Amino acid sequence: MQKFWSKTISVSEAVELAVKILKESIELKAIDIPIDRSIKMISSESIKCPIDLPPYNNSAVDGYAVRSIDTIGATQLNPVKLRVKCSMDTGDPPDKCGVLRDSEAVEVGTGAPLPEGADAVVMYEDSLKVGDYIEVFRQIAPFDNVNRAGDDFKAGEEAISEGTQLTVFHIGLLASLGLKNVRVYRPLKALILPTGSELVEPGELLQLGKKYSSTDYIVASLLREAGFIKVIKLSPTPDHVEEVKKALLKGLEKADLAITIGGSSIGSRDVVHRVIDSEGLWVFRGVALRPGRTTSLGLINRKPVFILSGNPVAAWAGFTAIIKPSIYKLYRSSPPVEPSIVATVSERIVNVAGYRSYVRVALSSNGLKYFVKPYMIHGSSYLSSIIKAHGYVVIPEEVEGYDVGEEVVVQLFTTRHLHVA
């Protein structure tokens, strides 16, 4: 029997088709939420600054606000003498000390507003307090030691563009602008359905011939890691067409899309494709991806159903290469950039012509640079091939591999792996 992935499409084609289907079947809606609940959500609109940041000129140091023109010619041997008329600190109104006039100074703390007339700040280190006066030992230029209004962001400037995934710093910016709420796209609802008569939930008694369901937990965690996806995870369903169909149809009533785990081939016990055959239609069946070539996409009741392998590494590759970028494109965004390093190949990394390969790799270092070699090329069912690997290398379809001595980009599974022996 010929397997359906003998006519696979490229990863790029799969992503393009998936994005098209997602856009046709899922309506993006905007919601307003408090900024302190918006971490990793996707901005649904361009946000303009309503005010300058900082909102007023303020001191960048502790010292004295002055008119820079009054310090012309100041040196250690020929200091300029200025009268200290007042002091200001953070939170004081800018008019507290009135207008700064000729040969006057105002003592200021870091962050304090500059009084009208002042255009620079003399640091304590460049002055000496003598009674009600200071001696200034250095000539300073206009706006020295001053945070100018609008230096950070100007009123009317775009602070956050549509499709931005909000980070802790974006939330800080929104708070600095006085915005209590932010408009974001509503979370996506994703159904996860693991299939397999051999699967039992973690915590249950493990009988001979059974194994704990784990790939569904990996995919659920990958979805939750995105931050803007609500996961509906079902318990494992046996390899019976009617049971899989029932679980899938009922689950899709509350979800925007589904991801099935396992049953992605056409063996006698791989029933997911039969459910798509009977209840929906295929968008693509199989992708030129290693591991993960059985990754597929169908439609049931106009809702996308992604099919991933039950093997954890193949499921991870299918999710990373196809599902993740497709969902981000739906949200007019792009996935966060993963940490990476450049390393020199110490053992040839091979590829199958026409396939995009996600090769798990191990790193080593001589103290000057990093070296990389394949780690467990085969074994997409082995979690150790990811747990014990330092990262992975993506080999494009048109590249047959990387030879010893070539430099490649290694995507790191975690930055703690940067320090290797």
Give the label of every model feature segment.
Residues I9-E13, A30-I33, V61, P115, ...:
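Conserved active-site and cofactor/substrate-binding residues in soluble primary-metabolism enzymes
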